[in-house]
């Protein structure tokens, strides 16, 4: 009996691969950067040991949706030319005794806007055609520029894979499968790993020489003029009380408002479909009632009855629009909301401090 396959639980990325992805994404910014990642699967942990970028080619004509925005760089991972290029690169890596197992691809993002049709189609292609145990690494260039590396690993859930393969995103099908926008991606924890040689080299690096001990200042004036105090983060600094909004937070709010507006547009389109469907069904009901009354009269006169299913030829019900775009937009709204929640704490604290000083009676309520 074959052993049960261990599900993927984590992703371990070499530091060199992270630096390659950061360099490629920064050089291509604001254009989307994509590339392939190779490594091995060790007991449910996907170890990524190497990467290489994709050349930009034209978007394939067989896109899942005709209204998808053409983006050659974002569509590069599933292009036929790049599939052959990737196979040739992996063959060359295997010849020099490097881990040459395809474990997924990477892409760059700006302000967390990676929930789009290109990412879905690319990851669907990898999990369906290349290797089911693959991941998509998403590097957010703008978030990383704030001083914190943003590198996340995603897979498409099995429930979403089934729905996307059959292209069943109507309201009825979504209710049957209980598919929600939270079920699109499965996020895996990412761990950055260094080899033992690199770790040993880092420990052997010389630490900066300690500065000479400073004498205690004789007075408060001398303390305020001391260069050590001016350079210290603990020194009194009124700039920390500035209420200026972080540009990253401001841009995220703008993108969130745009996504909410898109959500309202999709909702209005679906409501228009429901109104059109109700009108056509009312016409069909009226026609069927009229035909039944006419057949009753003909039956009384012993005349041949008229067919009652002729309405299928006379009336055409409107086709329900796909709910996939709405699901993706909802998932993107959730992504923007999480980013705003993580960045808003510092500004919110300052605003409450100002309110407490200006309106001391309000804080007690």
UniProtKB/Swiss-Prot annotation:
<comment type="similarity">
    <text>Belongs to the eIF-3 subunit H family.</text>
</comment>
<comment type="function">
    <text>Component of the eukaryotic translation initiation factor 3 (eIF-3) complex, which is involved in protein synthesis of a specialized repertoire of mRNAs and, together with other initiation factors, stimulates binding of mRNA and methionyl-tRNAi to the 40S ribosome. The eIF-3 complex specifically targets and initiates translation of a subset of mRNAs involved in cell proliferation.</text>
</comment>
<dbReference type="GO" id="GO:0033290">
    <property type="term" value="C:eukaryotic 48S preinitiation complex"/>
</dbReference>
<keyword id="KW-0396">Initiation factor</keyword>
<dbReference type="GO" id="GO:0005852">
    <property type="term" value="C:eukaryotic translation initiation factor 3 complex"/>
</dbReference>
<dbReference type="Pfam" id="PF01398">
    <property type="entry name" value="JAB"/>
</dbReference>
<dbReference type="GO" id="GO:0003743">
    <property type="term" value="F:translation initiation factor activity"/>
</dbReference>
<dbReference type="InterPro" id="IPR045810">
    <property type="entry name" value="eIF3h_C"/>
</dbReference>
<keyword id="KW-0648">Protein biosynthesis</keyword>
<dbReference type="InterPro" id="IPR000555">
    <property type="entry name" value="JAMM/MPN+_dom"/>
</dbReference>
<keyword id="KW-0963">Cytoplasm</keyword>
<dbReference type="GO" id="GO:0001732">
    <property type="term" value="P:formation of cytoplasmic translation initiation complex"/>
</dbReference>
<dbReference type="InterPro" id="IPR037518">
    <property type="entry name" value="MPN"/>
</dbReference>
<feature type="domain" description="MPN">
    <location>
        <begin position="11"/>
        <end position="160"/>
    </location>
</feature>
<protein>
    <recommendedName>
        <fullName>Eukaryotic translation initiation factor 3 subunit H</fullName>
    </recommendedName>
</protein>
<dbReference type="GO" id="GO:0008237">
    <property type="term" value="F:metallopeptidase activity"/>
</dbReference>
<dbReference type="Pfam" id="PF19445">
    <property type="entry name" value="eIF3h_C"/>
</dbReference>
<dbReference type="InterPro" id="IPR027524">
    <property type="entry name" value="eIF3h"/>
</dbReference>
<dbReference type="InterPro" id="IPR050242">
    <property type="entry name" value="JAMM_MPN+_peptidase_M67A"/>
</dbReference>
<dbReference type="GO" id="GO:0016282">
    <property type="term" value="C:eukaryotic 43S preinitiation complex"/>
</dbReference>
<comment type="subunit">
    <text>Component of the eukaryotic translation initiation factor 3 (eIF-3) complex.</text>
</comment>
């Amino acid at each position: 009996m074959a052993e049960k396959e261990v599900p993927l639980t984590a992703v371990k990325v070499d530091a060199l691969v992270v630096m390659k992805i950061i360099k490629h994404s920064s050089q291509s910014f604001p254009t989307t950067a994509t590339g392939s990642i190779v490594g091995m699967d060790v007991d449910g942990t996907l170890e990524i040991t190497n990467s290489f970028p994709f050349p930009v080619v034209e978007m394939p004509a067989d896109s899942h949706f005709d209204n998808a925005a053409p983006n050659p760089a974002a569509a590069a991972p599933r292009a036929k030319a790049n599939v052959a290029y990737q196979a040739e690169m992996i063959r060359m890596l295997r010849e020099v005794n490097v881990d040459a197992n395809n474990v997924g691809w990477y892409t760059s993002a700006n302000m967390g806007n990676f929930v789009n049709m290109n990412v879905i189609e690319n990851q669907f292609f990898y999990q369906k055609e290349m290797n089911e145990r693959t991941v998509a690494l998403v590097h957010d260039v703008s978030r990383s520029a704030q001083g914190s590396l943003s590198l996340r690993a995603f897979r498409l859930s099995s429930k979403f894979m089934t729905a996307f393969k059959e292209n069943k995103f109507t309201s009825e099908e979504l209710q049957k499968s209980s598919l929600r926008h939270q079920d699109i991606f499965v996020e895996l924890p990412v761990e950055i790993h260094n080899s033992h040689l690199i770790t040993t080299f880092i420990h052997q690096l010389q630490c900066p020489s300690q500065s000479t001990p400073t004498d205690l200042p004789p007075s408060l004036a001398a303390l305020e003029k001391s260069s050590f105090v001016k350079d210290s983060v603990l020194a009194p600094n009124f700039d920390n009380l500035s209420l200026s909004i972080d540009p990253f937070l401001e841009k995220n709010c703008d993108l969130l408002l745009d996504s909410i507006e898109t959500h309202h547009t999709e909702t209005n389109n679906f409501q228009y479909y429901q109104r059109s469907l109700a009108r056509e069904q009312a016409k069909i009901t009226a026609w069927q009632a009229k035909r039944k009354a006419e057949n009753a009269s003909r039956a009384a006169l012993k005349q041949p009855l008229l067919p009652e299913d002729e309405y299928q030829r006379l009336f055409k019900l409107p086709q329900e629009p796909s709910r996939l775009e709405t699901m993706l937009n909802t998932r993107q709204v959730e992504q923007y909301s999480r980013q705003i929640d993580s960045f808003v704490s510092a500004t919110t604290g300052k605003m409450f401090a100002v309110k407490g000083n200006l309106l001391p009676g309000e804080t007690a309520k």
